[in-house]
Amino acid sequence: MTAILERRESESLWGRFCNWITSTENRLYIGWFGVLMIPTLLTATSVFIIAFIAAPPVDIDGIREPVSGSLLYGNNIISGAIIPTSAAIGLHFYPIWEAASVDEWLYNGGPYELIVLHFLLGVACYMGREWELSFRLGMRPWIAVAYSAPVAAATAVFLIYPIGQGSFSDGMPLGISGTFNFMIVFQAEHNILMHPFHMLGVAGVFGGSLFSAMHGSLVTSSLIRETTENESANEGYRFGQEEETYNIVAAHGYFGRLIFQYASFNNSRSLHFFLAAWPVVGIWFTALGISTMAFNLNGFNFNQSVVDSQGRVINTWADIINRANLGMEVMHERNAHNFPLDLAAIEAPSTNG
């Protein structure tokens, strides 16, 4: 009888836990995805802060030339970064217990792999948590779909690209200058500026910014006056009010006359779908572009594509970009190899008389 009572109490405790985890009445919704999200993001954040402050230099290129990234080793907020895991480790799973010592783990950049893998798992769970909360509230799932764009972008630069290149040392460093270095080297090796998917991503980000500014300014300019001239127009809105807060007909008429009639949305729902979809699709394409260039399906190459009637090359902007790429590649990992890969790929002339 005692055993039965204990089992019922155990089930009751588990049931209360399940109800608490999935309750939409909590100040912050946890959810089943949150059970995994909270420890992974806390781990990634904690290790990032500690490593950014105090991690010793990392042998990123695997040539016994450690690179310093932490504040205590001479960096500032701009130059500091979590240095990627060493090329000597490659794509191997490298937890602390796989190293002979903590010093070896730090020297080979173990914190980078720990942070990145926990971070990617955490943000994926955050996306799942968005869907879970939407489902429990009876909402549509598009918030999680929109968030999938930055999740895809982060996964591309932190996981897919290192897999394609064969080493976590090619992943994006976790810092400001490290991000810029990653971008410059990516351009040098993959000509990303000439990749159509990157162009779509640029159109998505800048177009999304433009459309957001246009929408916000149109709404703000066509608010329905509910206050006196001595009060802020914002005071005329009450949270949860049923009445429209701005005149969409006036905004539609203004924009239709500013450009042309059919450039303006007359349906608020389709307008807001467009505002969400444009940047999301653009960032999806960018993530897809990074993922294809990870396996060296690079941007367009129009080098020396214009010649005169005598066969002499007429330089274009493509040739200018190509020369810049070679210059950046020469400066990249200059102690790891003597020549950039593009130049070293040419077969050496024969020396046999």
Swiss-Prot record:
Tyr-161 forms a radical intermediate that is referred to as redox-active TyrZ, YZ or Y-Z. C-terminally processed by CTPA; processing is essential to allow assembly of the oxygen-evolving complex and thus photosynthetic growth. The gene is psbA. PSII is composed of 1 copy each of membrane proteins PsbA, PsbB, PsbC, PsbD, PsbE, PsbF, PsbH, PsbI, PsbJ, PsbK, PsbL, PsbM, PsbT, PsbX, PsbY, PsbZ, Psb30/Ycf12, at least 3 peripheral proteins of the oxygen-evolving complex and a large number of cofactors. It forms dimeric complexes. Chlorophyll a PD1 binds at H198. The modification Phosphothreonine is found at T2. HAMAP family: PSII_PsbA_D1. The modification N-acetylthreonine is found at T2. The record marks A344, A345 as: Cleavage. It catalyses: 2 a plastoquinone + 4 hnu + 2 H2O = 2 a plastoquinol + O2. It comes from Spinacia oleracea (Spinach). PROSITE patterns: REACTION_CENTER. This is Photosystem II protein D1. It is a multi-pass membrane protein.
